[in-house]
């Protein structure tokens, strides 16, 4: 009976290790080029090609977010930025939740973070 328990425990450990290896291997890394391209095709129209915020989308409306705003960048986590992208904002930004998958969101958020650091470097 003891050998059966040892075998069962060994099997569970092996399956757990295999599962962890698979999940780590399947998780895609941030792709800077993809983040830049997604921004250019989806965000730049309102937020400006360089991320400095564009003109209001509608008369009397707020200006789109300036991603060079260091305080804004520091006050929000990557998860908060992803939620804004996924859900949109009441200020006129539409929801992009059905457009981007998790890996694309990570790449896009990484690009938004780079916009702030690029301005700081100038």
Regions found by a protein language model. Give the residues of each.
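The canonical Cys-X-X-Cys-His
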Residues: 39-49, 108-112
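Flexible gly/pro/ser-rich segments immediately N-terminal to CXXCH heme-c attachment motifs
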Residues: 38, 71, 97-100
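C-terminal capping alpha-helices of c-type cytochrome domains
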Residues: 80-91, 97-122
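Electrostatic cytochrome c docking/interface patches
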Residues: 23-38, 54-55, 122
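Detector for the c-type heme attachment site
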Residues: 27-28, 46-52, 86, 98
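Conserved beta-strand positions that form and line the central face of beta-propeller blades
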Residues: 25, 50, 66, 92-95
């Amino acid at each position: 009976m003891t050998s059966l328990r040892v075998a069962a425990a060994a099997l569970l450990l092996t399956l757990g290790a295999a599962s962890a290896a698979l999940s780590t291997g399947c998780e895609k890394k941030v792709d800077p080029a993809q983040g830049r391209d997604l921004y250019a095709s989806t965000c730049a129209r309102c937020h400006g090609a360089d991320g400095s915020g564009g003109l209001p989308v509608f008369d009397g409306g707020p200006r789109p977010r300036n991603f060079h705003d260091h305080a804004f960048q520091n006050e929000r986590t990557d998860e908060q930025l992803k939620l804004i992208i996924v859900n949109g904002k009441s200020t006129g930004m539409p929801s992009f939740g059905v457009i981007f998958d998790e890996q694309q969101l990570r790449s896009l958020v990484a690009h938004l973070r780079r916009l702030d650091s690029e301005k700081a470097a100038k």
